[in-house]
């Protein structure tokens, strides 16, 4: 099967990179909101 390598790419991407990216984006959003409020 040609797509046999897909799980080895998608699992770290969804399991590690996506949560780290969303946490960083959320942290930046909170920080920017905190700066504008004060």
From Swiss-Prot:
Instruction: Give TM segment ranges.
Output: 10-30
Query: Localized where?
Result: Plastid, Chloroplast thylakoid membrane
Its GO biological process annotations read: photosynthesis
Gene Ontology terms, cellular component aspect? chloroplast thylakoid membrane; photosystem I
Report the membrane topology from the UniProt record: Single-pass membrane protein
Main localisation, per the record? plastid
Q: Which UniProt keywords apply?
A: Chloroplast, Membrane, Photosynthesis, Photosystem I, Plastid, Thylakoid, Transmembrane, Transmembrane helix
Q: Which InterPro entries match?
A: PSI_PsaI, PSI_PsaI_sf
Domain of life where this protein originates: Eukaryota
- UniProt key word Cell inner membrane: no
What HAMAP family does its record include?
Answer: PSI_PsaI
Q: Which family does it belong to?
A: Belongs to the PsaI family.
Q: What does this protein do?
A: May help in the organization of the PsaL subunit.
Protein name (Swiss-Prot/TrEMBL)? Photosystem I reaction center subunit VIII
Origin species, per record, is: Trieres chinensis (Marine centric diatom)
């Amino acid at each position: 099967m040609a797509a046999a390598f897909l799980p080895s790419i998608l699992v770290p991407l969804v399991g590690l990179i996506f949560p780290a990216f969303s946490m960083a984006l959320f942290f930046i959003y909170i920080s920017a909101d905190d700066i504008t409020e004060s």
